[in-house]
Amino acid sequence: GKAVIYEIIGNDPAFVPVNELPYYQAELWVGLETERITKNANSNYSALAMPAPECDYRPDSMQIFRNNTEITHLFFMDNLEVNEAIGALNNNEFFTGFCEIVLKPKDALANNQFSKYTFKLFNKDGSIFETTSDFLKITL
């Protein structure tokens, strides 16, 4: 399998339509849930999923970095469809899951330009989670 690096790419025509799996729209926030990340052509954000000792079907802590400098955790709004997908991934005993990441329904988002975000998922032993699937690719 390949290393799973889930990319979040904003409004790229190549990723339309986003209403079909495995694509979801999400709104990305940092710090307090009312503090919105400013997205522009000069931003360079990436996020790493931090393994949790135990997790149910809710996402695990993730941290966001800008130019390798940690900012804070990521927050998303809930979306049943995405929670189900995360639950399916959690059925894999080697997947750590997520505990603070949920997605907002795509129809609630404005049509804005976003920068590219990269997520890396890790196994419980700290190694990169691998799969042959692009199952959880997310589109802002």
Regions found by a protein language model. Name each.
Residues 1-140:
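Non-catalytic macromolecular-recognition regions in eukaryotic signaling proteins
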